[in-house]
Swiss-Prot record:
GO terms for biological process: negative regulation of transcription by RNA polymerase II. It is found in: Nucleus. Highly expressed in testis. Not detected in the other tissues tested. Transcriptional repressor. GO terms for cellular component: nucleus. Residues 1-104 are annotated as: Transcription repressor. Pfam families: MBD_C, MBDa. Belongs to the MBD3L family. Keywords: Nucleus, Repressor, Transcription, Transcription regulation. The N-terminal half of the protein mediates transcription repression. The gene is Mbd3l1. This is Methyl-CpG-binding domain protein 3-like 1. The keyword Repressor applies.
Amino acid sequence: MGKTSQRKQCDCENPSKPCLSTSIPLRMSSYTFKRPVTKITSHLGNEVRYYQWEETLEKPEQACWQKRLQGLQAYSSAGELLSTSDLAKTLKDLTSTDTVASASDTQATSIDITSVPTLESSSHLANMIPEAGPQILCKEFLVTEQDIINQERKVKIARERLAVALIAHKLASEMETVRGSRKANL
């Protein structure tokens, strides 16, 4: 009985903790941020509570470079607006005419045309678009059914080799544990 009365006295002496409240929890980072930082997520049908000053907070900018480039437009050296289809067509025309013209040179040395970059087209492109600089343009690579079958075969062989290696590793580790337990028993 004496112990319980002592406990009651200790409970009465301890005031309630100030951190226990019904307000929205805030993460305070005084070193980095000037204001308390919270993440507000609203879901369909849910009511999200937030402070009035949080309504005016700016959302962070998109860090993904593709999203930032979506609104940009390409211009020619004359200042005309280029559409993406015109640019793609021009590049395709440049690469196809230059590779056909240089095909006789590459066939004499028996080098595959698709693997050789066209330097003439890059200089021609640099004349059309000075900001592009010297670039190496390559022909587009066509994937055939045979390429897919060969790749699937290589993947299957690699998986089989990996399975064999994992089984060998498992057996070796089991042998080590058995040897270790035998040495401990001796």
